[in-house]
Amino acid sequence: MKTLTSRIKRRVLLLINNFKSDCAFSILYALLRVMDELCGRVHLNKLSNIAHEKKDKWILNYLERQLSDLIQKYKNIDDIGVFEENAPVWVCWWTGVEMAPDLVKQCIKSIRKQTGSHPVHVIDQNSYSVYIDIPDYMMHKVKNGQMGIAHLSDYIRVSLLEKYGGLWLDSTIFCASSLPESYFELPFFTCKSNPTSCGYLSQMRWTTFVLGGWRGNVFYRFIKEAFEEYWSQEQA
């Protein structure tokens, strides 16, 4: 009983803290997020879905306003990039494989085994600078906690794919068989399933844990610059 009470208290405290921090961004967004969370907890799924969809729409509208110049810049550019044989496979564990849990080590081992002639590069905090540059303001926000490692990883993956192409695999993916060459033969590749209401904006139409494409694909160039624009202005 004490454990349950403690969990409830932690959840309520987290909800309150998130609401306070969200209010500094937008009161409407904060209210929609609370409604989504509370309705989901008491299984009012329809109301939760409504709040979630409105929250996503609000975010999309906000980003379209903030990134309007960048969107116009890339609106009419159609460049799918350059196909290269033996394009690399990218994996990231920020603190290094040596510090990773056994599960992650086994997954990375399986990836190395199943990629054939495609080189595997494991990116960490000591090796990223060999391949890409990360803006100082991003690293500063990572150090002070404003930008999480997951968000940094998002930037790293699109930067690598834009510059080198290849295939990004999350470090918790276990490869039980050889990776099909078809993954590398498309200018853009992602895992997907039939659209479903799942709480994610993608509705499973795309994923980022398996993501690939050709070097120089304008899609990744746009996303990379969008991340840079966003994090140069925002605090969370």
Language-model regions, residue ranges each:
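Active-site acidic Asp-centered loop
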Residues: 164, 169-170
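Glycosyltransferase-associated regions of secretory-pathway enzymes
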Residues: 1-153, 171-236
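Small-residue hinge/turn detector
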Residues: 155-164
